[in-house]
Amino acid sequence: MPCNRAVFGAFVLALLISLQSVYFKLYEFYKNNETARNTSVAGFLKRHEVAVNVIVEFSFDILFFLCGLLGFELSPTARRLIFRRTASAEKADTVELEHVSSRRRNDSRDDSTVRNVSKTSPLASQRSRDHFDGDPREPAPPAYSPADFYPPPASPHICETPLSTRVAPSAPSASLFTAGGIGLP
């Protein structure tokens, strides 16, 4: 559910911001506090200050990026690319087939071709229909037609050429500038 994912992403983001704030407070404490200067942590921070800052900032950036992915609803293609080998991709990318019980649809012992198939999958147009859908020799129509991916032809009133020739505007005259008080010679 996108709402739950977005709420979870916001929660994780709040935790990350709190964790980053705690890191900066501890860093300032060990760097500036007189009693903590003689500890091994303060010595390590002093010797490797730039490296520690770069590594910590980079890791927080990666965590913020991954947390941001939680809040976005990914397209089916992006889900397949990112979660290609996980079961969550199959679960998130399936289509409920009508007139077939879920037990029959997901039965691994069944040899029929009734399975969960993505709308955008090439298999959606190539799979043969079973006896629930009609003639088994008739191929299923494609999920999307090619016309969905190409722009429609332009309307004639948009591409109309004017009957009169157009003249390019000329450069402004000097009198235009002197009238405004610029005072060009």
From Swiss-Prot:
GO terms for cellular component: host cell membrane; membrane. Residues 114-126 have a biased composition (Polar residues). Its main location: host cell. It is found in: Host membrane. It is a single-pass membrane protein. Residues 96-185 are annotated as: Disordered. Residues 139-155 have a biased composition (Pro residues). It comes from the Viruses. The chain crosses the membrane at residues 50-70. Residues 96-113, 127-138 have a biased composition (Basic and acidic residues). Residues 1-24 form the signal peptide. Keywords: Host membrane, Membrane, Signal, Transmembrane, Transmembrane helix. This is Uncharacterized protein VP12. It comes from Colorado tick fever virus (strain USA/Florio N-7180) (CTFV).
